[in-house]
């Protein structure tokens, strides 16, 4: 077996506003695994200032090369060694799965892989000023999305609340589901709870990460008392061992967790999160993290497997149309 690392810099069609700033380019590292004339592709896609393994390019390549050499010799992924490097693990897992299946359809027995059913996805409204976000929101609604996700917490909350009200004036909660993601933009205390109450009056489905991570006492109180369900996202980053995952979920007791394999332990670690969440009746959905079509396809294939082709809620897998060049050879079609 031979494994090659290919750095790629993707260009966004339009600047992508996130809680960590505005992206115009995206650095990724493709994994090309070859064995007996069969090729498997994977994608390592760390996010600057967010991923636990967001290292300098030289550091990242050096470490990734070490792991690929080990896999070439042993034909085994060193899962325990890779726990602190989730984006590397996801890319290596994807390449091995592609190699072993011999197809972009990593799990060919699922209805999704057989093109017999799709995966419902939400329409994501990127950050911007209020006018930009309003236009993007209306476009998603025109495109027929029945689940809209709004990034909030960066602008004036009253203005952000008006966006939610605008949807509710047009559509009831049975017609359009609204999710909001605060990216830690609220402060613990009465002010946070008041905002949650205002969102609850508009039948918001859930809010992701209302306060910044590593405030577990405050977060547990919010999860217990919030009038709308709480979903954890950034809080899961860096929680690597199985015992830590159990402890976090048992203490905080969120209603949902949002899983991004590139950030939350690769597929191996994300499956641990799912197993522990199920024991506590915590629901989950999967979200991509600005991967190209190679990574997005791997996440979608895995999501179909974990969900057994049954979806009680929309997944966050609609980011494949962001890049100028996006590996169109991957047989992945994005629609509402």
Task: Give residue spans per PLM region.
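Generic structural signal for hydrophobic core residues of well-folded globular domains
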Residues: 99-100, 303-306
